[in-house]
Curated annotation (Swiss-Prot):
Chain segments annotated as coiled-coil in the UniProt record: none
A Pfam family it matches: LIX1
InterPro entries: Autophagy-related_EPG5, LIX1
GO BP terms in the entry: autophagosome maturation
Official protein name in the record: Protein limb expression 1
GO terms for cellular component: cytoplasm
Signal peptide stretch: none
Species of origin: Gallus gallus (Chicken)
Amino acid sequence: MDRTLESLQLVIARVLPHRDPALVFKDLNVVAILQEFWESKQKKKAVLPSEGIIVYESLSSLGPPFVSYVTLPGGSCFGNFQSCLSRAEARRDAAKVALINSLFNELPCRRITKEFIMESVQEAVSSTSGNLKDADDPSTSIGAYHYMLESNIGKTMLEFQELMIVFQLLHWNGSLKALRETKCSRQEVISYYSQCSLDEKMRSHMALDWIMKEQESPGIISQELQVALRELEEVRKAGHELRFYKEKKEILSLALSQIYSDEVTTSSWDNQMSLALHGYR
């Protein structure tokens, strides 16, 4: 633990040279420090200003505990894990979680290397009772995972997670299974979706898929939404990256809103959402 803390302090000294590494996480202005950290990174990459924006979102609530999310450039998302008595406190706590993860992501051990790939594939084989020989066959799950890691050598784990989010959602949505049934190879699917960003168009398509599922199995969206909300809260309180769970919640909420928008008034829609979330609460 001491060695990790020392490594993080070295990262702070390199990226934020005018800050005292020992005081960064105690600074109440952690929101500004997080902004400064990412502005420093974006300048080195010479990206457009709009691509370096940090976005904060506070959940509407009549009283504490308050919840705040912060989305970093690239899409990684974190939330406050402490029980916060004010929106400002929740925002600071979310920023602190994001800053710790951002700094940790700069460590050499968080970069994809040949050694990292070998260890990850071996772990995947052990956890799935697979075969190490499958790593060279992109048509297998292990082979597809190996191919994706190889395609992203040199990237950090946060960058890799940002790519994986699309495939996680496609798997959850059932789209990957449907693509396999059309005889598309895993390699073709990976190559295509690696170039796709998770935008409003993709979310709308996924919401439409869930609307079709709802027609076949009434109530499935509400059930999935309850699960997604429970998972989101658990992951947030653990201080982990939570974009996958947040995207699931937003896609399912979008699907519900589209189903009822033409059938009920705004007040009835609010009642429907309350009923959908009743099991979660």
